[in-house]
């Protein structure tokens, strides 16, 4: 998939609208707690500034439901962006109207203007054409660098592309290049590492990627649905009964297609209060047991399977990572993948958070900024924010 790149646009002295995803956590004072997504957009912003563009940044934050709400303001984001760029960031209190028009008209080459939260207008999520046209009138070129919002057909993601020449920013290009590699031309052997609580989040992903991979290792609470499909006692562990049939079918397809599937088979088990912690094999589970993390045997088996791989896509923590008692599986497999000689791509918000917490971020080829967007891309869907950027032929 080839996208029209920002490199192909003549940006000098042009008003360039950049859709970024600055949907970051804030503290009670409105200060940025985690600037991962802001940092990810810096290469595009810096390129535009260096090349003399007048940069107009547009983002959403949270879900203010189409109403102005101070706790979802981007003022704190502007402050953090100024610190990261060592540069003044101008701030407009809206994305449409006289104030933002005056601010845009006053921009000089190399200036950066961040507009207030676009989701303060309900027209954004409705993909309202008139609203998109109004915002488009502020600029001469549109750049989408918000991969993580590109599975939404919103006014500043998809609608705006009908009114301006549209290009991909560097983050968008990087995301699409790495994720396309996973579906089109991975180095083999190619393995998935899957965790998290729900199979339901990954049904389409599994259906699309099973024929493309050489194997997968499955941990997290989702593995209990696979064990139930094989008739095992899983105690009170999380299970999706309506997907037991799907899990059974997937395991059968994997066998037919000669794919290696490694299910976590021992667990860090506790009761509902997360007390009385012990290690148990799946075959020893009692009716009250709950598995909260993969056990040492599973960690060893996962490593033995993954050591063969050249490409790995990891989506989902392997245990209840936010509780230190149940973080060992994610930590050990994460550390193993961080030292892995092949290409590892990490996708999903919880997995990215775990990788950052373990301070392994820089060790991976790519940590995707997109949770839902990266999964939908890997499911084979054409994302509404990306389709207008694709070079035909």
Swiss-Prot record:
Keywords: ATP-binding, Cytoplasm, Glycolysis, Kinase, Nucleotide-binding, Transferase. One of its GO terms (cellular component) is cytosol. Substrate binds at residues 21-23, 37, 60-63, 119, 152. It is found in: Cytoplasm. It is an enzyme of class 2 (transferase). ATP binds at residues 202, 291, 322, 348-351. GO terms for molecular function: ADP binding; ATP binding; phosphoglycerate kinase activity. The keyword DNA-binding does not apply. GO terms for biological process: gluconeogenesis; glycolytic process. Its EC number is 2.7.2.3. It catalyses: (2R)-3-phosphoglycerate + ATP = (2R)-3-phospho-glyceroyl phosphate + ADP. It comes from the Bacteria. Pathway: Carbohydrate degradation; glycolysis; pyruvate from D-glyceraldehyde 3-phosphate: step 2/5. InterPro entries: Phosphoglycerate_kinase, Phosphoglycerate_kinase_CS, Phosphoglycerate_kinase_N, Phosphoglycerate_kinase_sf. Monomer. Belongs to the phosphoglycerate kinase family. PANTHER family: PHOSPHOGLYCERATE KINASE, PHOSPHOGLYCERATE KINASE 1, CHLOROPLASTIC-RELATED. This is Phosphoglycerate kinase.
């Amino acid at each position: 998939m080839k996208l029209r790149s920002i490199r192909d646009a003549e940006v000098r002295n042009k008003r360039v609208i950049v859709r970024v995803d600055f949907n970051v956590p804030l503290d009670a004072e409105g200060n940025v707690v985690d600037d991962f997504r802001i940092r990810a957009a810096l290469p595009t912003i810096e390129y535009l500034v260096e090349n003399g563009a007048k940069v107009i940044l547009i983002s959403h934050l949270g879900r203010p439901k189409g109403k102005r709400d101070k706790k979802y303001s981007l003022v704190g984001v502007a402050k953090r962006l100024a610190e990261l760029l060592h540069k003044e960031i101008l701030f407009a209190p809206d994305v449409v109207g006289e104030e933002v028009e005056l601010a845009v008209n006053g921009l000089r080459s190399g200036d950066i203007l961040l507009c207030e939260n676009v989701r303060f207008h309900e027209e954004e999520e409705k993909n309202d054409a008139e609203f998109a046209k109004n915002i488009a009138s502020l600029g001469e070129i549109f750049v989408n660098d918000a991969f993580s919002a590109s599975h939404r057909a919103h006014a500043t993601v998809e609608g705006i592309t009908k009114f301006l020449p549209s290009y991909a920013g560097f983050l968008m290009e990087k995301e699409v290049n790495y994720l396309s590699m996973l579906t089109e031309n991975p180095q083999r052997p190619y393995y998935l590492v899957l965790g998290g609580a729900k199979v339901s989040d990954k049904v389409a992903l599994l259906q699309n990627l099973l024929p493309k991979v050489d194997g997968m290792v499955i941990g997290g609470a989702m593995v209990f649905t696979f064990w139930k499909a094989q008739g095992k006692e899983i105690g009170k562990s999380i299970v999706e009964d309506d997907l037991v049939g799907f899990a059974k079918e997937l395991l059968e397809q994997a066998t037919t297609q000669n794919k290696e599937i490694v299910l976590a088979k021992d667990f860090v088990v506790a009761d509902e209060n997360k007390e009385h912690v012990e290690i148990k094999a799946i075959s020893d589970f009692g009716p009250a047991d709950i598995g909260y993390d993969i056990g040492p045997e599973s960690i060893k088996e996962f490593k033995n399977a993954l050591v063969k791989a050249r490409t790995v896509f990891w989506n989902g923590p392997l245990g209840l990572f936010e509780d230190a008692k149940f973080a060992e599986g994610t930590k050990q497999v994460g550390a193993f993948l961080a030292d892995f000689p092949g290409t590892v791509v990490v996708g999903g918000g919880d997995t990215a958070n775990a990788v950052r917490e373990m301070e392994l971020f820089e060790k991976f080829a790519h940590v995707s900024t997109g949770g839902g967007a990266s999964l939908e891309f890997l499911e084979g869907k054409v994302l509404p924010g990306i389709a207008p950027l694709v070079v035909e032929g």
